[in-house]
């Protein structure tokens, strides 16, 4: 396992799902994790990981609010003196066919999935620049590349994440900061658990490795890009989809 010993990592949307998996893997790798979420369940997740030996603490943060993000960042800097890694994992879906989609459904997804990257990254980057080191890794998606019915809003944000990644890496590389993204494919989740078995089988049939992914799979994908060993990799979207859509 790559080591993150002594590093401070922010993981947004860490209360459950892929974010929870990233928190667990990063703690196993030795990082101290700030779990950000608007859900109070984040505290329970942090307590569980901490009880298993992880160095993790919960901050209730609204990533769309510059004030909320700024206060959380300053609290981390005051206590730990630095931020090495920012994982922009938090995201939402509001699926509906395009002609029936409301402006609220469109704007809410854009705000959380894309605009929040501006807020969090701009708050953290000055500290990374000062330290001469940093890793920013954001959540894209296979559907940002292949699209999906009823997800015009979501797909637009995830394609935007990859564009944001390619652009920002050109600005901050000279500061020792790399910027990358991870695009998960079909991942086991509370949503997939509620799907009919035939739908899951049809999805797995499209995945060459023969199974759906797990939060742990995603955690290791993020761990690689967050490691010092990945220091020459920047501006990419890592497609973690079992070969469902090779890039």
Show which residues each predicted segment covers.
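Residue(s) in the substrate-gating loop at a strand-loop-helix junction
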Residues: 141
């Amino acid at each position: 396992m790559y080591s993150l010993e002594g590093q401070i990592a922010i993981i947004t949307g860490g209360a459950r799902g892929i974010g929870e998996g990233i928190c667990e893997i990063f703690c196993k790798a030795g990082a101290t994790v700030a779990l950000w979420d608007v859900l109070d369940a984040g505290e329970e997740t942090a307590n569980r990981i901490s009880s298993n030996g992880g160095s993790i603490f919960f901050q209730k943060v609204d990533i769309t609010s510059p004030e909320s993000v700024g206060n959380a960042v300053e609290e981390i800097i005051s206590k730990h003196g630095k931020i090495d890694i920012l994982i922009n994992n938090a995201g939402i879906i509001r699926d509906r066919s395009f002609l029936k989609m409301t402006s609220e459904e469109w704007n809410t997804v854009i705000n959380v999935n894309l605009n929040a990257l501006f807020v969090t990254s701009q708050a953290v980057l000055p500290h990374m620049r000062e330290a001469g080191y940093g890793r920013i890794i954001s959540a894209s998606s296979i559907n940002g590349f292949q699209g999906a019915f009823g997800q015009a809003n979501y797909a637009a944000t995830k394609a935007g994440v990859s564009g944001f990644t390619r652009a920002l890496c050109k600005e901050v590389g000279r500061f020792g900061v790399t910027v990358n993204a991870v695009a998960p494919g079909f991942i086991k989740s509370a949503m997939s658990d509620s799907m009919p078995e035939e739908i899951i089988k049809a999805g797995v049939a499209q995945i060459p490795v023969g199974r759906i992914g797990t939060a742990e799979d995603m955690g290791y994908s993020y761990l690689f890009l967050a490691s010092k060993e990945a220091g020459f990799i920047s501006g990419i979207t890592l497609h973690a989809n079992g070969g469902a859509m090779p890039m």
